[in-house]
């Protein structure tokens, strides 16, 4: 306070002509990208109003930051929490045990987390939903949340207090859905806010409702100027539509459903397999804590499906394959399964898609 007392709170006008925000992407499949975004005057206020409506955050809550501040989603949650006068608790570690312990210790009311962390918490030995009794709002984002995991958490957090956001650091668009609305549209990530979403095929043509294609989004006239640092910008068409390579579909009511990243689609024997679909099935098994599915080169299949699995009790490959056959056709079943004590996650709590097997 003594140091700051001798300085004006006002910045000279030429120091920050246009407020700018820089965040890092998740970096789960490669080098993290630094993404810069201009924030013209007034835009931050409008963004905050949108945030309150889609995330469930209120003023003066006890808030836990379950992610690093250099990543977009935790940074936004922290910034907006400070704006709301929230008390912010910042964990030294982002493992499931630490998060649950701090929620109980500080009686946390608001928390935002990734589905990977939700899965690890629910698979903790001795976990009880009473451990999270203080939570008034939980908002999840930053990865695929299976329907089974979502329903599991809807038994822990009441539907009207569980929010889901689908967005990306590139700020091309955002959808959201609350738990009670999700129960009417299971599997959906919600509707687009302040803009439009289009699903297109490889030739750029829009596809019918219910058909999977590449997700394009546009804020219209409200699109922020977003650039990668030291990388080419995302292509944008005349209507402002851009894509980060996610795949999904829109139903007749305008609800968006996420399938997977285009780069995570495995072509095996001429068939397209989304890694996320196989991962979600494997994670249904009660002994599976986490699973990652990748495609490995194969002389017969082009690529074979390989799973890396973390378990909390002994289980064999044959048992998991038999289990998966209850939900998936044979061509989507892993041809090989690798067991590990711990699937690595990055600082954001998102799975890192790396394995010794990937070097084969």
Predicted regions and their residues:
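Conserved structural elements of the adenylate-forming
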Residues: 6, 13, 20, 34-58
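Gly/Ser/Thr-rich phosphate-binding loop
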Residues: 23-26, 83, 109-110, 126-185, ...
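Conserved small/polar residues in nucleotide/adenosyl-binding loops
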Residues: 25, 353-359
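Conserved AMP-binding/adenylation subdomain of ANL enzymes
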Residues: 43-63, 70-109, 124
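AMP-binding/adenylate-forming catalytic core of the ANL superfamily
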Residues: 103, 111, 239, 245-333, ...
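Conserved beta-loop-beta connector loops within the AMP-binding
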Residues: 185, 198-218, 249-253, 313-317, ...
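Conserved ATP/PPi-binding loop(s) of AMP-dependent carboxylate-activating enzymes
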Residues: 191-192, 205-236, 255, 271-273
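Flexible lysine-rich "adenylation lid" loop at the C-terminal edge of ANL adenylation domains
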Residues: 203-204, 328, 340-355
């Amino acid at each position: 306070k003594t140091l700051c007392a001798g300085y004006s709170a006002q910045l000279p006008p030429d120091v920050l002509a246009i407020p700018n925000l820089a965040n890092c992407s998740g970096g789960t499949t490669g080098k993290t990208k630094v993404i810069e975004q201009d924030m013209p005057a007034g835009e931050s206020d409008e963004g905050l109003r949108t945030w309150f409506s889609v995330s469930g955050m209120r003023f003066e809550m006890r808030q836990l930051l379950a992610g690093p501040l250099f990543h977009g989603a935790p940074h936004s949650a922290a910034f907006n929490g400070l704006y709301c006068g929230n008390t912010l608790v910042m964990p030294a570690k982002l493992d499931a045990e630490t998060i649950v312990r701090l929620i109980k210790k500080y009686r946390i009311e608001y928390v935002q987390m990734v589905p990977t962390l939700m899965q690890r918490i629910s698979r903790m030995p001795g976990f009880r939903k009473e451990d999270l009794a203080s939570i008034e709002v939980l908002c999840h984002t930053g990865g695929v949340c299976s329907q089974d995991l979502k329903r599991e958490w809807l038994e822990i957090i009441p539907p009207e207090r569980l929010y889901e956001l689908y967005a990306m650091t590139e700020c091309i668009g955002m959808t959201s859905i609350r738990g009670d609305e999700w129960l009417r549209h299971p599997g959906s990530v919600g509707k687009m806010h302040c803009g439009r979403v289009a699903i297109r095929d490889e030739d750029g043509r829009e596809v019918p409702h219910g058909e999977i294609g590449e997700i394009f989004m546009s804020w219209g006239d409200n699109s922020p100027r977003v650039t990668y640092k030291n990388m080419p910008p995302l292509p944008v068409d005349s209507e402002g539509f851009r894509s980060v390579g996610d795949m999904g579909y829109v139903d007749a009511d305008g609800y968006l459903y996420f399938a997977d990243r285009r780069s995570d689609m495995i072509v095996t024997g001429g068939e397209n397999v989304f890694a996320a679909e196989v991962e979600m099935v494997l994670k249904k098994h009660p002994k599976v804590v986490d699973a990652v599915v990748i495609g490995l080169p194969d002389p017969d299949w082009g690529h074979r499906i390989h799973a890396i699995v973390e378990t909390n009790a002994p289980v064999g490959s044959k048992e998991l394959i038999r289990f998966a056959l209850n939900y998936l056709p044979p061509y989507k079943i892993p041809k090989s399964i690798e067991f590990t004590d711990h699937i690595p996650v990055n600082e954001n709590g998102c799975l890192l898609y790396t394995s010794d097997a990937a070097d084969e």
